[in-house]
């Protein structure tokens, strides 16, 4: 019936309007934030260690980040490598810093993997320490290959196909509405792997980052 179709379109219009308002509010909120890190800083630091054994590179990077940003990098006893299954790929991450608007983490795969990048309300950049990163952007017919020392940037709302070779490791920086990225990162837990222990590890790592930021904000860097 015409009235039913009109009502359905009214609901669709309302939902799209709400989504548009939420997106605008999110970006206005981001515009008021004082960020701790920058994409350029993380990329420059990671490039210094590109080509090294990834474990050595990561340990040196962590020391340098703590020196430059005291009170914003998790202590060694709270660092944990956690599996990530999302978009058809599998990797592992270690969160160094996390807030509502930023994160810094170590990421990679020992075996190689490929899948969908996801779409985010955030900009994500990866600077490669070892291995290869293949990216096929939406709307194109050719892929690109990135090597150690190079940075791959994934803009807000973008989607790509990606593939990592065996023993590919990188440093990742994200800026945007960070809680929104968890929906993609955790979806496979509910609909595929049902690995709820990894879900717990992931949420605990993010909660630790939020707690550290709150503690530093309230009591200063030496708390």
UniProtKB/Swiss-Prot annotation:
Keyword Repeat: no
Region (Targeting to endoplasmic reticulum-associated lipid droplets): 2-8
Keywords (A to Z) from UniProt: Cell junction, Cell membrane, Cell projection, Cytoplasmic vesicle, Endoplasmic reticulum, Lipid droplet, Lipid transport, Membrane, Nucleus, Postsynaptic cell membrane, Receptor, Synapse, Transmembrane, Transmembrane helix, Transport
GO cellular component, one term: postsynapse
Predominant localisation class: nucleus
Tagged with keyword Transport: yes
UniProt subcellular location: Nucleus inner membrane; Nucleus outer membrane; Nucleus envelope; Cytoplasmic vesicle
GO biological process: lipid transport; nervous system development; protein homotrimerization; regulation of neuron apoptotic process; regulation of postsynapse assembly
Function: Functions in lipid transport from the endoplasmic reticulum and is involved in a wide array of cellular functions probably through regulation of the biogenesis of lipid microdomains at the plasma membrane. Involved in the regulation of different receptors it plays a role in BDNF signaling and EGF signaling. Also regulates ion channels like the potassium channel and could modulate neurotransmitter release. Plays a role in calcium signaling through modulation together with ANK2 of the ITP3R-dependent calcium efflux at the endoplasmic reticulum.
Family in the record: Belongs to the ERG2 family.
Protein name per the record: Sigma non-opioid intracellular receptor 1
Organism from which the protein derives: Mus musculus (Mouse)
Gene from which this protein is expressed: Sigmar1
């Amino acid at each position: 019936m015409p009235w039913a179709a009109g009502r359905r379109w009214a609901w669709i219009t309302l939902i799209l309007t709400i989504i548009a308002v939420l997106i605008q509010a999110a970006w206005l909120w981001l515009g008021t934030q004082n960020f701790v890190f920058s994409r350029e800083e993380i990329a420059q630091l990671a490039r210094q260690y590109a080509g090294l054994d990834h474990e050595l590179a990561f340990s040196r990077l962590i020391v340098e980040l703590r020196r430059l940003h005291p009170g914003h990098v998790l202590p060694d006893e709270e660092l944990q490598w956690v599996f990530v299954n999302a978009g058809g790929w599998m990797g592992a991450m270690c969160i160094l810093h996390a807030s509502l608007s930023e994160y810094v983490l170590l990421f990679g795969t020992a075996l190689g993997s490929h899948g969908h990048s996801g779409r985010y309300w955030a900009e994500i950049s990866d600077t490669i320490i070892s291995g290869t990163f293949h990216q096929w952007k939406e709307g194109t017919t050719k892929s690109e290959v990135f090597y150690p020392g190079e940075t791959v940037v994934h803009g807000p709302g973008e989607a790509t196909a990606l593939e990592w070779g065996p023993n590919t490791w990188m440093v990742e920086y994200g800026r945007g509405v960070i809680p929104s990225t968890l929906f993609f990162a955790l979806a496979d837990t509910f609909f595929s792997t049902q690995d709820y222990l990894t879900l717990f590890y992931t949420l605990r790592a993010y909660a630790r980052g939020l707690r550290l930021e709150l503690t530093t904000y309230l009591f200063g860097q030496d708390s």
